[in-house]
Amino acid sequence: MTSRKIPSIMGTQHPDNANAPFWESSQQPFISAYRETGEAFENFNELNVDEYMWDWEGKHADAAVIDRLFSTEYDYFKDHQIGRDKFLTFRFPNIWEEKGYNLMQAMTAFLSSEDFAHDLGFSRPLFEAILPMAQRADQILKMQVLFEKLANFKSAEFTRSDKNTPYIEMIPLFEDFETQLHAPEILKEYLNLHEEHFGFRPKYMRVFLAGSDSALTAGFMSSITGNKLAIARLHEFAEEENIEIFPISGTGSAIFRGGLSPHRIDRYVTEFPGVRTATVQSAFRYDFPIEEVQKGIAELKEKLPVAEPLKISLDDQKILTEIAEESAKFYSNTLDNLVPSMQAIFKAFPKRRDRRQHVGVLGYSRSVDGIELPRAINFTGSFYSVGVPPEFIGFGRALKHLDADHLSVFVRSYPSMSKDFNELARFVNMDALQILKTQNSAWAEVEEDILIMQRIFKFEIGPQTREEQQHAEIALQVVQFKDGAPVAITALINRMAQLRHFLG
């Protein structure tokens, strides 16, 4: 069993917060790159997160983060050492998807931080990194080989005293259904490549499963099913290969993106048992009273490490795989036709972080059937902003399409389904949907999804609280004026986000 502490809570920089952070005196929800070092400390200190993701993928990041934290908060980090008690985990850029100009900068930060920590008598602060959009075993090893070469070069040419550690641990981030489903096969090949190069097999691995991009590209039914299959198969793999696997689940507060909020802790643990690290994104941390946030984090820390991992029989795995693949077709076919009518909303969507340009030389884009999509938070919030939660897209028709055996397995695998869609129905605005239908007939398919779910679960469609009523009224305004002034639409989207406690 690994002797290191495995973090239960990872704070992230996902820009899904509606409100200003609790530590932000200006009460502005936008968080500049210059404030993110202080943000990391506040999350360690005030919220007691175990780990904080430092994101280099498609955004600006400060390479001096460790130097700044040690210099400004020396007493705290003397007692709560990064790399031993608290963890700062870099998410590297994926050099197969973007130019990766800052990969060497990120890797160099590992080395200089180790030097600084050594001089202070601290533990090595940075020793593992996330590889986003991992597709193949050789990509995971490539990151380690590049780091090894850089560390050895620095030790030979620039270091006069102790040599740098020429090894980092990698956390593959599997983002789509196929890579999540086949994570065990990818990891098996990686372990062989690792042993071939380094002469030993890791005793443990942390494996990151995305909840947002899988929903964006294949729909909510496929995403939640894929996450469950991956968790179950990873724990099976751990037993077969005699290696400890600690799954990380990337989930936002919107149900479409995983549904983890301070109000849904039990639901999360029920749906994803076997996850050992949960991401608490910006909405979780900043869109609820701080006492509720602290309580939710404490509860997750108590429940995640001891939850009995999800077990799915081979027969049920086969059925769930078929369900995920079929449901993705309903989602994608409809989405292809909806995206053009959502462009004005996507463009007006408010920003919360310093991002690099999304496409072209500096970045990359997500796409479905060749159609470019915005990031998952923008996408999710945009559909909520027109009164149509994206969880419904394709879900109703896919559910109706299931035969008795498939339906039985799916219902058993998703115990919160009825409760989730009862909640989601309160954010549906049928008046707004009727207007959207007159502009684009593809919205009729989404209406069909909603009505099928209503017939099955007997829920009421529309708001049930004062805040939800305000949300519905604003959604109608957004639809009526969506091609008007973007500044006005942005203001409306911001207000709706505050009412539902997440931006997207």
From Swiss-Prot:
The keyword Lyase applies. Residues 1-21 are annotated as: Disordered. Its cofactor is Mg(2+). It comes from the Bacteria. Signal peptide: none annotated. The keyword Transmembrane helix does not apply. This is Phosphoenolpyruvate carboxylase. Disulfide bonds: none annotated. Keywords: Carbon dioxide fixation, Lyase, Magnesium. Its EC number is 4.1.1.31.
